[in-house]
Curated annotation (Swiss-Prot):
Name the record gives this protein: Bestrophin homolog 26
Principal subcellular localization: membrane
Bilayer topology annotation: Multi-pass membrane protein
Transmembrane segments: 30-50, 73-93, 235-255, 272-292
Pfam family, one: Bestrophin
Record has Cell membrane as a keyword: yes
GO molecular function: chloride channel activity
Species, as recorded: Caenorhabditis elegans
InterPro entries the record matches: Bestrophin, Bestrophin-like
Quaternary structure and partners: Forms oligomers.
Amino acid sequence: MTVPYYRDVPTGNALRNFFKIMLKRKGNLFTAIFKELCLFLGLYFLFMVIYRLVLPKSGGQREIRKIVENLLSHQEFTIPLEFLLGFFVSSVVDRWRKSLDSLAYIESCAHAVVIGFPPNSNGSDKNLLIRRTIIRYLVVSQILLYREISLKVRRRFKKLTILGKAKLLNQNEIDKLNKLECKHYDIYFLPISWALSLIEDKIDKENLANEFTILWGQIKEWQTKLSLLRNCDYIPIPLAYPQAVFLAVRCYFAVCVFTRQHLDRYDSKMHTWITFFPVLTTFQYIFMMGWMKVAEILLNPMGEDEDDFELNFIIDNNLKNGLDIVSGLCGNHRKLAEHEIENDCRPYYQTNEQDRKKNRAPPESLKNVEFKSFTMEKASKDSPMVVKSESVCCLRRRFNSSAKKHHDSKV
C-alpha cells in the first residue's frame, strides 16, 4: 500500500518537514538502497586495502594507477547517467499515473444503477435484486482482471471456486466462467455482459432506452478503465530500456569503486579521514541509486512493494459501497423540509482565534483596494491619446495605398 505522509507535512516548515519525512520507516529511501550501499562501500574499502597494502609489495601499483586514471578520464563521457535516468523515470512515472487514473471505483456506477432501476414507492422493491446483481457482476469483473495482473489478488482468489465461497458467484455462473477460462485470453468481460443483458431485458419489457443512457455510459467507463489496466500489463516498457538503465547505473558505480580512490600514497593529507571515506561519492550513490529505485518501484504498481496499489482494498471498498448504495443503506431521502441554514448560511467554525485566522476567506488580490476620488471626462482633440490614435490610422492608410500600388504594378 502506498505510504501516506501528507499528514506529516501540513505546513511549509522546511526543517520540520525534512525530519518528518526522512524519519519515515516504511518506504524509506535508505531502506531501499541500504544493502547495495553496504556492498558498494565494502568493495571500495576492499580495493583500498589491496591498493595500499598488497600492490606495493608486488610492484603492480603504478600500472593499476595508470589504468584507474584512464578510467577516470573517460567515465563521465561514456555513461550519461543523468540523461538515462531522467528520461526513464519520467516515462515510468507517466505510466504509473495512467495506471492510477485507471483504478475504477464503483460509486458512480451504483448511483447510475439506482437511477436506471429505481426503488418502488409502494414498499415492494422488485428492482432490488437486479441492482445488487449488477453491482456484484461489476465487482466480479474487476476481480477477474486484477487476479491476472496483481499477485496479491491472485493469491487471494487462487481459483474461481473461491468466488463462490465468498458468495460473489453461484455455481451456475462459475460453470459458465470455467467454460470460457483460457490461459491466453481474458474472461473479465463476461460478468459485464451479464450486467448488460439485465439492462437489455428491462429495456425490452418496458421500452425505456433513454432512461438507461447514464447507466450505459458508466458501465462503459468502468470497462474502459479495466481495459487500460490490462493494456499497461500486457504492453510494458520495452525490456531493453530498463535493462540499459539499470545496467548503466550499476556499471557506473562499479567503476567508481576504482576511480574515486585517493591514489597518491605520499600525499600529506592522506592520513585524514576524508581521504579514506568517499563522502561525495556516497552522496552521489544515495541520490542516483535512490532515483533509480523510484523507477524500479513504480515500474509495476500492481506488485507487492510498500508503495504499490492496494487492489484488495479497492475490491472490498467497491463491493461494500456499491451494495450499500443500491440497497438504500446510504440514505433514501425523499421528504423535503425547510431548514435553518436556508436563512442563515454563515460558515461554522471553532471559536479559536488562531483557527479562525487560518480559515479566513481568501479575497481577490484587488478586492479591498480603494482609490482616491476623481472625475472622468472625454479626452480633448489635443490629447496625446487622440493624436496617437490618428497617427496610427494615417500609417495604416499609407501602408494600404502602397500595397495596392505594388499589386497594380505587378498586374
